[in-house]
């Protein structure tokens, strides 16, 4: 009898309890609501931008192969390769390397992922109270650099694309219209000029990204911003400005051609004197 009473009592207690205590916010991972407290968190947020460059259809391999295949600088063998639609120009918005697959972002997604992360940094960095002005400025410039590179790649592949310079939600993401390519190019230039500490006339106007060697290996530098600006101007046939930016890279005195051309493909010679910006693996 005592056993029956105990069972009934326990059953009443269990069925009468609220389950609210079982519903807990994530306790072992950061969220948008509990982030941006200190310098370390700001740096980690910026570091996530570097990670996007290592994704499959970014600079890891897909982005490089896409351009070379479409330009006929290389071809693909076999009949089952996911790159085949690019080789014979039968690709469409649903193709794996454009739209993505179950295990990776496509060309479209990987660069908009970069844009989102850059905007996340730029919209939240001012919330951080415990951060030095030097690291804050560096972080802002890094975010502008990565957003510029992302939109550069989007505009050269797709032309008119949605232009986001702020964080967006699902509704805006699904209803966004394409922005004319010329306005996207303007934003790319604007972001890179900010990262390089230059005004529209290419004169110093602010604090640029740090020089090569000041921080840990692999971070973007003023030289990278100058060099990418030169590339952006070249694509737009703004040759005078491209020449100015290329000369700025040379005048830094930190880069030179490698005496041994083959060393550029030697794993033991990575981040050499000819390297302006390398993705670290």
Language-model regions: role of each:
Residues 33, 60-80, 164, 201-228, ...:
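Short, surface-exposed recognition loops and adjoining beta-strand edges that mediate ligand/DNA contacts
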Residues 10-16:
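Hydrophobic h-region of N-terminal signal peptides that target proteins for export
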Residues 2-10:
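Sec-dependent signal peptide recognition
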Residues 17-70, 264-265:
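Membrane-proximal, proline-rich intrinsically disordered regions
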Residues 38-43, 47, 51-58, 80-158, ...:
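Conserved, well-structured interaction surfaces
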Residues 150-160, 229-238:
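Extended, well-ordered alpha-helical segments in internal regulatory regions
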Residues 27-31, 96, 165-172, 208-214:
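Short linear capping/connector segments at secondary-structure termini
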């Amino acid at each position: 009898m005592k056993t029956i009473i105990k069972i009934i009592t326990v059953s009443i207690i269990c069925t009468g309890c609220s389950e609210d205590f079982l519903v807990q916010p994530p306790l072992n991972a950061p969220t948008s609501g509990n982030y941006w407290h200190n310098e370390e968190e700001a740096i980690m947020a910026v570091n996530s931008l570097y990670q996007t460059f290592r994704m499959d259809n970014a600079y890891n391999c897909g982005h490089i192969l896409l351009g070379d295949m479409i330009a006929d600088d290389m071809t693909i063998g076999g009949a089952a390769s996911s790159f085949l639609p690019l080789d014979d120009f039968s690709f469409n918005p649903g193709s794996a390397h454009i739209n993505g697959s179950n295990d990776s972002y496509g060309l479209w997604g990987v660069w908009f992922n970069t844009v989102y992360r850059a905007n996340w940094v730029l919209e939240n960095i001012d919330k951080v109270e415990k951060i030095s002005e030097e690291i804050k400025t560096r972080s802002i410039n890094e975010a502008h650099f990565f957003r510029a590179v992302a939109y550069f790649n989007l505009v050269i592949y797709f032309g008119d694309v949605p232009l986001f310079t702020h964080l967006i939600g699902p509704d805006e993401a699904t209803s966004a219209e394409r922005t004319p390519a010329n306005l996207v190019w303007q934003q790319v230039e604007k972001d890179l000029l900010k990262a390089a500490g230059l005004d529209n006339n290419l004169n110093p106007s602010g604090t640029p990204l740090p020089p090569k060697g000041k921080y840990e290996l692999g971070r973007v530098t003023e030289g990278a911003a100058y060099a990418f600006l030169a590339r952006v101007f070249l694509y737009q046939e703004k040759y005078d400005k491209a020449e100015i930016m290329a000369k700025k890279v040379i005048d830094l005195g930190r880069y030179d051609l490698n005496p041994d051309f083959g060393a550029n493909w030697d794993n033991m010679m990575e981040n050499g004197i000819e390297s302006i910006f390398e993705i670290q693996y």
